[in-house]
Amino acid sequence: MPKYYCDYCDTYLTHDSPSVRKTHCTGRKHRDNVKFYYQKWMEEQAQHLIDATTAAFKAGKITNNPFAGGPGGAPPKPAGVSIPPPNMGAPPRPGMPGMPYMPPLMNPMMGMRPPPIMNPMAMMGPPPPLGTIPGVRPGIMNGPK
């Protein structure tokens, strides 16, 4: 009977059946080993990217650093380009100074619809009857009788 070998755990299971594999794969040790394997793989990929970037920089393939700041720590602006003023009618962008007490806008949870936006005209109620003054109750127009 063939045995099942788990690469993550570096072990053989007693026999190759779906129930044994399922029990093994749901176990704490197996899940920890899988998590450790992918963490190690991500660290290796990050180190490879760092090494490749460093080698390219030393070889002169990267001439300037796009992340290096200009005077005062701000990145240099291209000639003739100016930053437009903030839109006063729109909500502030995240990180904009001036309103530090405002919480960030939250996205609705998946599957939930956002609350309906009421039309200001719909909140006023029905229009007054013809021949009446808006804002005055109909029984008060001519005074008490």
UniProtKB/Swiss-Prot annotation:
Compositionally skewed regions (Pro residues) per UniProt: 73-91
Signal peptide range in chain numbering: none
GO MF terms held by the record: mRNA binding; pre-mRNA 5'-splice site binding; U1 snRNA binding; zinc ion binding
Region (Disordered): 67-91
InterPro entries: Matrin/U1-C_Znf_C2H2 (IPR000690), Matrin/U1-like-C_Znf_C2H2 (IPR003604), U1-CZ_Znf_C2H2 (IPR013085), U1_snRNP-C (IPR017340), Znf_C2H2_sf (IPR036236)
Locations listed in the record: Nucleus
Keywords per UniProt: Metal-binding, Nucleus, Ribonucleoprotein, RNA-binding, Zinc, Zinc-finger
GO biological process terms held by the UniProt record: mRNA 5'-splice site recognition; mRNA splicing, via spliceosome; regulation of alternative mRNA splicing, via spliceosome; spliceosomal snRNP assembly
CC terms in the record's Gene Ontology section: commitment complex; nucleus; small nuclear ribonucleoprotein complex; U1 snRNP; U2-type prespliceosome
Gene3D superfamilies named in the record: Classic Zinc Finger
Main location group: nucleus
Zinc finger (Matrin-type): 4-36
HAMAP family, per database record: U1_C
Similarity section: Belongs to the U1 small nuclear ribonucleoprotein C family.
Assembly and oligomerization: U1 snRNP is composed of the 7 core Sm proteins B/B', D1, D2, D3, E, F and G that assemble in a heptameric protein ring on the Sm site of the small nuclear RNA to form the core snRNP, and at least 3 U1 snRNP-specific proteins U1-70K, U1-A and U1-C. U1-C interacts with U1 snRNA and the 5' splice-site region of the pre-mRNA.
Cited function: Component of the spliceosomal U1 snRNP, which is essential for recognition of the pre-mRNA 5' splice-site and the subsequent assembly of the spliceosome. U1-C is directly involved in initial 5' splice-site recognition for both constitutive and regulated alternative splicing. The interaction with the 5' splice-site seems to precede base-pairing between the pre-mRNA and the U1 snRNA. Stimulates commitment or early (E) complex formation by stabilizing the base pairing of the 5' end of the U1 snRNA and the 5' splice-site region. Regulates alternative splicing of a distinct group of target genes.
Record's protein name: U1 small nuclear ribonucleoprotein C
Organism: Drosophila melanogaster (Fruit fly)
Gene this protein is translated from: snRNP-U1-C
